[in-house]
UniProtKB/Swiss-Prot annotation:
Residues at the active site: 244
Family: Belongs to the class I-like SAM-binding methyltransferase superfamily. Cation-independent O-methyltransferase family.
Protein's recorded name: 6-hydroxytryprostatin B O-methyltransferase
Pathway recorded for this protein: Alkaloid biosynthesis
Enzymatic reactions: 6-hydroxytryprostatin B + S-adenosyl-L-methionine = tryprostatin A + S-adenosyl-L-homocysteine + H(+)
InterPro entries found in the cross-reference section: COMT-like, O_MeTrfase_dom, SAM-dependent_MTases_sf, WH-like_DNA-bd_sf, WH_DNA-bd_sf
Residues where S-adenosyl-L-methionine binds: 201
Role: 6-hydroxytryprostatin B O-methyltransferase; part of the gene cluster that mediates the biosynthesis of fumitremorgins, indole alkaloids that carry not only intriguing chemical structures, but also interesting biological and pharmacological activities. The biosynthesis of fumitremorgin-type alkaloids begins by condensation of the two amino acids L-tryptophan and L-proline to brevianamide F, catalyzed by the non-ribosomal peptide synthetase ftmA.
Enzyme class: transferase
Self-association and partners: Homodimer.
Keywords of this entry: Alkaloid metabolism, Methyltransferase, S-adenosyl-L-methionine, Transferase, Virulence
Site annotation Required for binding 6-hydroxytryprostatin B: residues: 202
Gene label: ftmMT
Gene3D superfamilies named among the record's database cross-references: Vaccinia Virus protein VP39 (3.40.50.150), Winged helix-like DNA-binding domain superfamily/Winged helix DNA-binding domain (1.10.10.10)
Native source species: Aspergillus fumigatus (Neosartorya fumigata)
């Protein structure tokens, strides 16, 4: 109950856009604050909410009882990218969790995206299934932008580990599948300037990437749907933070489409979180990874996978693929797994 109240109250204030209406310096009385909100709320009720959240560090009051920012809530004014992530989580990260039980009743496997927690949250009243995560975002440009901005922040914090995650010196040509606007490719090619990299993604993302003025000459961009056959022949194919967004059946489709292009000696490289065995590693690390696993389930009906699960998924797609190694760069939440085609 304690954490539910903490999370639910802060979520409510974020969705009411209260932090946006509080001045960064100074304060604002409750009567004036409620007049700025798009959603009507009684000043006394708003006061009750804020007088609770101030005790956990979100918003505060001055000596006269007017509302002012705390360091945590000031992020909504000072840091738009992080604020966008918080708003996205208020809409999509928390609410689907209350549909987990209902989702299990409809889909005990946890694999049906249209009966997953988020789909049930977004469904029409009385329906037994709903839209997928990506379909929801397609109709919600505000949260779509928050999602992409959040992914950019997340990627910026993790990209630095990519250059040291694999011996890129042995690779001459690389296909970065689902590589967005080429941020990861740029890190690799700046550290290993001999590599020729093809970045593949959806048409609208590739169009945006091509408009950037800082493209490296060794990076080319190509429109590609990874559920269709891979058109490029290369030394290595790279899936970074892709498979954890998809259930096992869809991951099998993705890997098999790459398999059609593999030649002897080519490598499949997958960089994703790898779930530990229970009790393996630190409690903090395991908690973070398993929280991510449940997050993938609630949003996508997907999962984080253990090494055994990842190997089984890949090697069942193509018997020519022999597992080589797993390497986790120091400080990274994701590991690099490599297979060679024999």
């Amino acid at each position: 109950m304690t954490q539910a109240v903490d999370i639910g109250t802060i979520q409510t204030l974020i969705r009411l856009e209260v932090p946006d209406q509080v001045p960064l310096t100074g304060s604002i009385p409750y009567d004036a604050l409620v007049k700025k909100l798009k959603t009507p709320v009684d000043p006394e009720l708003l006061q009750r909410l804020i007088r609770f959240t101030r005790l956990v560090g979100f918003l505060d009051e001055d000596a006269e009882g007017a509302v002012k920012h705390s360091p945590m809530s000031a992020i909504f004014v000072n840091d738009p990218d992080t604020a966008g992530q918080a708003r996205f989580m208020a809409d999509f990260g928390i609410r689907p969790c209350s549909f987990i039980y209902e989702s299990i009743k409809l889909d005990p496997s946890g694999e049906a995206a249209r009966q997953g927690p988020l789909a049930l949250m977004a469904r029409e009243p009385g329906a037994r299934e709903g839209p997928t995560f990506f379909e929801v975002l397609e109709k919600d440009p505000v949260n779509r932008k928050r999602w992409h901005d959040g992914m950019a922040v997340h990627n910026d914090s993790m990209v630095r580990h990519v250059a040291g995650a694999y011996d890129w010196g042995t690779v001459q040509s690389l296909v970065d599948i689902g590589g967005s606007e080429g941020h990861v490719a740029a890190v690799i090619v700046n550290a290993f300037p001999h590599i020729q990299i093809t970045v593949q993604d959806r048409p609208e993302i590739i169009e945006k990437a091509r408009q950037r003025g800082d493209r490296h000459p060794n990076i080319i961009f190509e429109e590609h749907d990874f559920f269709t056959p891979q058109p490029r022949i290369a030394d290595a194919y790279f899936l970074r933070l892709i498979l954890h967004d998809w259930n096992d059946a869809d991951c099998t489709r993705i890997v098999r489409q790459i398999s059609s292009a593999l030649r002897p000696g080519a490598r499949l490289l997958i960089m994703d979180a790898v779930l530990p065995e229970p009790g393996e590693g630190s409690l903090q690390s395991e908690r973070r990874l398993r929280r991510s696993d449940i997050g993938m389930y609630t949003l996508f009906s997907a999962k984080e996978r253990s090494l055994a699960q990842m190997r089984r998924l890949v090697e069942d797609c193509d018997s020519r693929l022999r597992f080589e190694k797993l390497y986790t760069p120091p400080g990274s939440h994701a590991s690099m797994l490599s297979w060679i085609c024999e």
